[in-house]
Amino acid sequence: MFRGASAINLDTKGRIAIPKRYREPLRAEYNGQLVITVDFQSSCLLLYPLDEWSKIEAKLLLLSDTRASERAMKRLLLGYAHECELDGNGRLLLPPPLRQYANLEKHAMLVGQLNKFELWDEAAWQQQIEQSRETIRSEEFASNERLADFSL
């Protein structure tokens, strides 16, 4: 399970170094194999261990190719999907189209989301945090039935 937010940098070749605390679990449980794709709702990337990505692909397989919205989602998620493996130094190479989609240049945030990571441009992450705070303070959040019984 992945949690926490880590500030990371892209090198001149477009590689990121996965924080050390995640490297061994990724290698031990997933052989260091990941799939990187885009988030169709936000300007960030999603990094899934290959086994977790296989579950997503199984769900995508059930979607229609004739319904425009389902086809659009499949196009984005599968079209951008890039399989990769941690190198000996715990780095991943981000292909240029993925870097462009998320506006990644130098400073980024790797954010654990239990079964996956989100990879954000650092400035975009800060904006997202502010938007999330506003959402939490909104009436819509307060009236969400699924969150009514959620407590910390």
Curated annotation (Swiss-Prot):
GO terms for molecular function: DNA-binding transcription factor activity; transcription cis-regulatory region binding. GO terms for biological process: negative regulation of DNA-templated transcription initiation. Residues 5-52, 81-124 form the SpoVT-AbrB domain. GO terms for cellular component: cytoplasm; nucleoid. SUPFAM superfamilies: AbrB/MazE/MraZ-like. Its main location: cytoplasm. It is found in: Cytoplasm, Nucleoid. Pfam families: MraZ (PF02381). Keywords: Cytoplasm, DNA-binding, Repeat, Transcription, Transcription regulation. It comes from the Bacteria. NCBIfam families: division/cell wall cluster transcriptional repressor MraZ (TIGR00242). Forms oligomers. Belongs to the MraZ family. This is Transcriptional regulator MraZ. It comes from Shewanella violacea (strain JCM 10179 / CIP 106290 / LMG 19151 / DSS12).
